[in-house]
Amino acid sequence: MLRRILLACYLLLAPSLAACACETATPVDWMSSSGLPVLPVRPAHCAAVSQSPPDFNWPHRRLGDRYQLVVRSVVGVEQSVSTTSNWHMWDKPFAPGTYTWWVVANDPAGKAWRSASREFTLPPGTPVFVVPATASLLAQARARPHPRGLPQGTARAELVRVLAAEREPGWRQLLARVDADLKRGTVAEPTVDPRNQTERADQVKVIQSLWAMMNVEQTRVLEAALVAALTPNADYLAHAHRLILGLAAWNPDGPSSHASQFQVNRALAVVLAIGFDWLYDTWSADERTALLRRIGRRIGPIVSSAVGPTRDMEHNALNSVGLTNLGVVAGVAVLTAGDLPSADEWFEQAVPLYTNLLWPWGGDDGGYANGLNYAMWEVADAWWVLDSLRNATGLDLGTKPYLRNFGRMLAYFVPPGSRQGLFGDGAEQDMPHVYARYIKALALRVDSPYLAWLAAQSHGEDISNMALLVAPVTLVSGTLPPSAQNDLALLSVGWAAMHSSLPAHDRVSVYFKSSPYGSISHSHAEQNSFVLHVGAEPLLMAGGQYDWYGSPHGLGYYKQTRAHNAVTFDGGKGQAILDQGASGRIIGFQGGESLAWVEGDATLAYRGSVNRAWRRIYFFKPDLVMIEDKMSSSVPRRWEINLHAAEPLRWRDEQLEVSNGKAKGCGTVWTESGLDFEQATEPLPLSSSAGAGARWHGIFRTRGLMTELHALTVVDLACRASGRYIVKTAAQGFNVTAGAANFRLP
């Protein structure tokens, strides 16, 4: 049976008749015109929220303003709060129903700026997530004896038990590494400073080498600290002390400084804070003082970049580096509150904001617009913060509905058997072991049946990784929910997944993106683009390679529209990069057992170069995909349909063949005026640190200049036509002949 999401209702999750009555035009006011990037407005207008009470966010109008947030129920009951922050979390659940909310910004001169009213619906049965008062959380953290970041009492006993039972193979591997490391000395402090390099490429090489060294050393030191904390052995303890004090001796103004290599400085702050906490009772008073002093030096500039006087993360939450910094400040504050004089203030600033934002790259539906590669690194950076908050304060972010739905998102966009991510920087990297590691680490911390199902079928992870070994001891069921469909659209981020069969490893999967977040941060100029997988093999994929952020290859090709399965014109011109306003949106979606389709509008992404950029993808299950494009421009253009593959595309007599190993597709690319075809291997990045060889870039270009394009691309995974696919226009739509089969498109 076909199921349809009526986008006029802008339903992010469960359908709601109340939400369908909402006028969906985005209100035009100071909250919608504050400039980009900004803190996204939540709850979105006409949204059906998935958390009670919902998180409230809005853009800062101007630093120094005071805000009055007002929420009115459908029966006229109002509640309000005055705040200098542009976000708020209520301290009790909301009753199911429809609500209207607005914000009044009061500037220092006494002028008031009222926003338009926005509406949201809270369906019956919405999960409750109430955050205790910050003062209460801080008091609990301060009262908690060290080690706060590790479980205590019966929870600690249970952790020790599983390390000797079901997690014993991984624990044994970690112990073996630490045993082999006992006679190694401390790593030498780096002496080469990126700031002293005159060429950008040389600077990047030093930055990357410093991070590679620190990544290894961070793991080494934390493993030693964990073994020393859980095993009563003098040799382990002396080894952990030696490593931690060795890192503490590094010059915080040298090559490892925040100004020189912020990732290294951040990792040092984390290692020192965890080492201080986990081994607290084994440090002398002088050693504790020295460690706290060094933690303060390391964390100081991180605090300034996240929650300092300029309140950067409130102004621009869509800052990948700043978001990680915010989590680090929150985690370090939890571990050092009451010990480090400034830690209480950091706690009060960072913990509630981190709880509210978490990962602000999507809405309640669990979307993550910054790409799946960076979604995994969010988990890598956050697991110890989640553990520290839960163990020290009782605040369990694993019960936050967004994280539950984030788990559902992973199940649909990196389903079992996937080797690569989707969309954005690093999506092409083949690292199933990394995905398995962090999917399982998250599944042990987040109550999500979709995530549990995905974790049970993910394999190849390093079972000795700390994110897995110290995870909460929970029972994880590996059963896909009976209500699970084969298709999913996440409207908040403009992503859609359509599968022939979600549970099957040999599934055919069509992934589509047309994102309201545009091409900001690690996202690419790929609105209305798609990726096609056959089982684990990407048949039609995005192009380019991620060498380093902001590289010539990244800016000149990798992030560009022409490096994706999308439409360009006049020699590869396309959408704007590094621009949140260069956005798209899903305007139609329908899932089903035999047919699914998704429709996107990417007109804004081209920043005025086109008048219309429309694409609809039909998936005739299990193995036929058709992509319809409509483009228009005031200026005549040569339009280009770009396709990317691992092997050369074959185009003869207007018939297409594409393959990747055993995966194969046949079809055609059609326009009424005909197309010229050319292809070449893609440009490679200068950096040798990027991935494997180049992909093939096929360009189907209109033969003349025209103001409009109407095109249809057919990809048949069964190759049923024995080499012949015929497209004919009908009174309305198309008739497509594929061998003996006929398909009609509306």
Model regions and ranges:
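Low-complexity, Pro/Ser/Thr- and charge-rich linker/hinge segments at domain boundaries
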Residues: T26-M31, T121-G149, R652
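Pro/Thr/Ser/Gly-rich low-complexity, intrinsically disordered linker/stalk tracts
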Residues: E23-R62, E119-P123
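Aromatic-lined, polymer-binding surfaces characteristic
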Residues: R156, R172-A176, T191, V206-V414
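Surface-exposed, short loops/turns at beta-strand junctions within beta-sandwich domains
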Residues: D91-T98
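Carbohydrate-active enzyme catalytic cores, enriched for enzymes
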Residues: T310, T336, Y374-L539, F589-E593, ...
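CBM-like, beta-strand-rich accessory domains located in the C-terminal region of large
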Residues: Y546, G550-P746
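Extracellular fibronectin type III
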Residues: P108-P124
